[in-house]
Amino acid sequence: DTEHNVPGGEYLSKQLKAIKCNHMHIVFGMVDDKDIQGVLDLLPQNATYYFTKANNKRAVSENVLKLYAQTKNLQGESYPDVKSAYDAAKKAADNNDFVFVGGSSYVVADLLKNCI
């Protein structure tokens, strides 16, 4: 699951906790008709975030998402598109780190279209 809603977030948070790595880098964006606060509540606080938005009219601004996330003690920077967020996460990640891309399925679609 990409964690686009609370039930998906509950499942994914268990999966992320099980991953053995030095540090987690999370490229994250959402659309405006989802429970943003509820999903953010489920994300790990010990990760670095790369807040972004998909190329979709329903996408929440990366800057607004960052502000919401800061109220949940999630720290990171904002990026105007998925490619720049993903590139920054890859550059910052070491060999024993883990990079996750999700939040909205549109974010994953942009990753597949533009980065892989």
Describe every region a protein language model picked out:
Residues D1, Y49, V101-S104:
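Residue-level signal for inorganic ion chemistry
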Residues L40-F98:
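C-terminal helical cap/extension that packs against the catalytic core
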Residues T2-T48:
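Nucleotide phosphate-binding/pyrophosphate-handling subdomain across enzymes
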Residues F28-D32, T52-A54, G103:
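Cofactor-binding loop segments of dinucleotide-utilizing enzymes, especially the Rossmann-like FAD-
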Residues S104-I116:
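Glycine/aspartate-rich loop-and-adjacent alpha/beta segment that forms the canonical ThDP
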Residues G9, I36-G38, S61-E62, D110-K113:
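Short glycine-/acidic-enriched loop or helix-start segments at secondary-structure transitions
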Residues M24-I26, D97-V101:
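Generic beta-sheet signal
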